[in-house]
From Swiss-Prot:
A cellular component annotation (GO) from this entry: cytoplasm
Key word Kinase present: yes
EC number(s) stated in the UniProt entry for this protein: 2.7.1.39
Localization in the cell: Cytoplasm
Superkingdom, taxonomy of origin: Bacteria
Role, per record: Catalyzes the ATP-dependent phosphorylation of L-homoserine to L-homoserine phosphate.
Protein name per Swiss-Prot or TrEMBL: Homoserine kinase
Name of encoding gene: thrB
PROSITE patterns, per database record: GHMP_KINASES_ATP
GO BP annotation list: threonine biosynthetic process
Binding site for ATP: P97, I98, G99, S100, G101, L102, G103, S104, S105, A106, C107
Pfam families: GHMP_kinases_C, GHMP_kinases_N
């Protein structure tokens, strides 16, 4: 008995919703932009194997890997429910660059916990599992936040609510939009990207932020794509973080001139996203980004759609 779960890349913040909005994306060409985790019966309580394009970026000691932490908290929750934890072997296929702004840690966390839950016949419900995912994300970044794990697990665009026992809810989206994702191949640490933000904001920035976020959510619910795209603006993080991203301002200008609806920083960067209505525009923007924003062979550009499914079982073998 074995199960493999794939968890897709995600855009934290989506520019307009700092720490409260996230979107899952998948390339239109079928490329797996995300991590996979396999869980199978094992001889010992826990064994971890690693594979994938970015395997060399993982800690050498399995007990320093976030997947080990996921197994520990999952075991803790099973004990509370008096469910027996099976001896198992986990394999993390690390396809996502670390520190990329694509929700790399969320991919590993979501794939690991979803696979563990599936392997044990789903003893934890969706909300319980999502709460664990947020806890694990907090272990890495220093504070519990759901703007990557929620869309990665549940799919689509997710708005973080964290009230009445509701962690997040999905926001109606525009399924004909293309999301061009460009990772330059350099690393930006989330901690550094947070440290650069001011401790206090001017009143006019707070008012603008509220208007853009409320306007975006309203436009999504009333299905006004042009208005929604106009509202994808960031006054909280982007003005400060763009100095950490070589070439971002130039890329944003090019994308706008080429016909993109909006361009922003994915999470804390360095990946950027560009929203386009027509595939021809998306392809033009993608070509330019490949030639001008990508800095080394680790970088890449993908034309994506929203991933409405989130994490999913892809079979029993990697």
């Amino acid at each position: 008995m074995s199960v493999v779960v794939y968890a897709p890349a995600s855009i934290g913040n989506v520019s307009v919703g700092f720490d409260v909005l996230g979107a899952a994306v998948s390339p239109i060409d079928g490329t797996l932009l995300g991590d996979r985790v396999k869980v199978e019966a094992g001889a010992e309580a826990f064994t971890l194997k690693t594979a994938g394009r970015f395997v060399d970026k993982l800690p050498a000691n399995p007990q320093e890997n976030i997947v080990y932490d996921c197994w520990q908290v999952f075991a803790r929750e099973l004990e509370k429910k008096s469910v027996v934890l099976k001896p198992l072997t986990m394999t993390l296929e690390k396809n996502m660059p670390i520190g990329s702004g694509l929700g790399s840690s969320a991919c590993s966390i979501v794939a690991a916990l979803d696979a563990l839950n599936q392997f044990h016949a789903s003893p934890l419900d969706e909300t319980e599992l999502l709460a664990l995912m947020g806890e694990m994300e907090g272990k890495i970044s220093g504070s519990i936040h759901y703007d990557n794990v929620a869309p990665c697990y549940l799919g689509g665009v997710q708005l973080m609510l964290e009230e009445l026992g509701i962690i997040s809810q999905s926001v109606p989206s525009f399924d004909d939009w293309y999301w061009v994702m460009a990772y330059p191949g350099i690393k930006v640490s989330t901690a550094e990207a947070r440290a650069i933000l001011p401790a206090q904001y001017r009143r006019q920035d707070i008012v603008a932020h509220g208007r853009y976020l409320a306007g975006f959510i309203h436009a999504c619910h009333t299905q006004q794509p042009e208005l929604a795209a106009k509202m994808i603006k960031d006054v909280i993080a982007e003005p400060y973080r763009e100095k950490l991203l070589p070439g971002f301002a130039k890329a944003r200008s090019y994308a706008a001139a080429a016909g993109a609806l909006a361009t922003g920083i994915s999470g804390s960067g360095p990946t950027l996203f560009s929203v386009c209505k027509e595939q021809a525009v998306a392809e033009r923007v993608a070509r330019w980004l490949e030639q001008n924003y990508v800095q080394n062979e680790e970088g890449f550009v993908h034309i994506c759609r929203l991933d409405k499914q989130g994490s999913k079982v892809t079979g029993s073998e990697l």
